[in-house]
Amino acid sequence: MWPLLHVLWLALVCGSVHTTLSKSDAKKAASKMLLEKTQFSDKPVQDRGLVVTDIKAEDVVLEHRSYCSSRARERNFAGEVLGYVTPWNSHGYDVAKVFGSKFTQISPVWLQLKRRGREMFEITGLHDVDQGWMRAVKKHAKGVRIVPRLLFEDWTYDDFRNVLDSEDEIEELSKTVAQVAKNQHFDGFVVEVWSQLLSQKHVGLIHMLTHLAEALHQARLLVILVIPPAVTPGTDQLGMFTHKEFEQLAPILDGFSLMTYDYSTSQQPGPNAPLSWIRACVQVLDPKSQWRSKILLGLNFYGMDYAASKDAREPVIGARYVQTLKDHRPRVVWDSQAAEHFFEYKKNRGGRHVVFYPTLKSLQVRLELARELGVGVSIWELGQGLDYFYDLL
């Protein structure tokens, strides 16, 4: 594990006070509100000296809303870029409209596929579909494809067994999915199913996904599969989806949304996605670089807040991150091994915390790695990040 973090975490648990403000100092600090720019910039973050390891809390607060509007439709990353949008972080809808040209696919998290009985399937969540928003995104970004996430929800083991063992069930499932895509003017789907099924049924799942892809491709629709990391976090063991499965599905599917985040746990706090682990996940999947362009390296636009006293963690999105920087003005530290920033702060009654959240530098390093490996990226999710992140894409 990361030596620097071990030292920090020991200090948190033992109650070190060397970086804690006195009450009088805290009152003085609170009286000086940190400023936030509300206007666009005529230069991207790369030209403003902001993509650095030595960042300051006040600079993040000041600059995070200020993106380069004149280049909002220009791409800096040549590979595939998939961006997820969720109804519970609605700012992502605006991000997709403003920066849509920087993406090849946008995936709204709207839909669930449910089995209602023998050869009976239903896609729920259609009440969340926003046709006006879809038209607006495509109006400003001509080449972008709208591919909603389709989650296999409330499936029992018997549901999977009955479907995977029946060609008629698979055909009916594929028809249902293709028909909804046609009716709703979707360009395909991001399918999330792999992590919900035990490994002994993966042969049948590959068979089903192959048939589903054939049906959707006949309708000129895309199929992207969400896959877990190929290397289990914190170990050298292979994950649930490895080179064996990738080799079978890569010629058939259009992409793979690789979940290279959530590396650390509340029991072992640390970085969200260490760089060496990300690299290993890609290399294990495709060691010969045959299908690398179909791998979409997962980038988290959220962070984690670890509480030392409670042995717990909570996700952190952009607004909370900025507010924490305002309230505590912490010293932000660069972990060179993981290539991520983190900081420590203390709540009045809640004990000590450490926060890992993406920064311009950590994202730039990962985009450079994606270029080196020849892969695309997938972002979870657009409503959780800071606006100036998109200058990098």
Curated annotation (Swiss-Prot):
Gene Ontology biological process terms from the UniProt entry: carbohydrate metabolic process; innate immune response; negative regulation of cytokine production involved in inflammatory response
Signal peptide positions on this chain: 1-19
Keywords assigned: Immunity, Innate immunity, Lysosome, Secreted, Signal
Name this polypeptide is given: Chitinase domain-containing protein 1
Family statement: Belongs to the glycosyl hydrolase 18 family.
Organism: Mus musculus
Record lineage: Eukaryota, Metazoa, Chordata, Craniata, Vertebrata
Main localisation: secreted
MF GO annotations: chitin binding; oligosaccharide binding
